[in-house]
Amino acid sequence: YRVVDIQSRVAHVATRIPFRYGIAEMTQAPHMVLELTLKRGTESARGWASEDLPPKWFTKDPDSEFRDDVVDMVDVIAHATAVAPTLAAPTAFDLWWQLHESQKRWARANGVPGLLAGLGTALVERALIDAACRLDGLSFDEAIMSGTLGFESQRVHPELEHQSLDEAFSGRGGNELSIRHTVGLSDPLTDDEVVDDPADGLPVSLDAVIARYGVDHFKIKTKGDLSADISRIRRILELASAHKIEPWFTIDGNESMTS
């Protein structure tokens, strides 16, 4: 497996409504699209991946300029895309592993935070997986379970050495996905709290979103203020109860963590 061509493009996108997370609120951001060609012998296929480049997502420095944050994100992507075509491996996973290790060494040598460096690796990884699946006309789960990708979980997490994929995932495949709705820190819960209404006929408040779409899976952003966070979660549970849905949710407060 070799990456014989890799290109990236940037589009400027705007959010429908402001999205607040941690110390930042996003209304617009660059959107990176990456395209690569993966070659195996005489065969080749193209793969794609894309990612927003949001301020303060990978680094939590309140004093840095947004322009500098974007440059830092572009730099880690540029390094990963420069390294990828220099590698060759017997499997797609081995190719990713080489890139992963190279990116880590570069990050340590240049004082780049690991989470930020991982952005570059992950973007190439997703395009690589897409291309590898297209080479054999397989879905992602088929490529994983058949061994086509060469995935070795124990190389990432040694404690999984004696855990086979068949044992872990056999019979767990599905043909449905639940839509998970993210509740941002400043997202209005009810219509009377709506401030930034785009007037496009689509719901804005969480109450209106549940009423329109019937969503019952949520990711709730928290800010580290225990009293305020608990109060907000209670209100969300009350909304779910009013709509007679059984809510499933995760709590996301990583932006408020210091270590």
Q: What feature does the model see in each segment?
A:
Residues P158-S259:
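Metal-dependent enolase-superfamily TIM-barrel catalytic cores that perform enediolate-based chemistry
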Residues Y1-E35, K39:
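Short, Gly/Pro- and small/polar-rich lid/capping loops
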Residues Y21, S50-F58, H181-L185:
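Glycine-rich phosphate/pyrophosphate-binding beta-alpha loops
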Residues L38-E43, G173:
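Short acidic-glycine loop/turn motifs at beta-strand connectors
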Residues S44-E142, S146-G147:
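Metal- or metallocofactor-binding catalytic centers and their adjacent structured scaffolds
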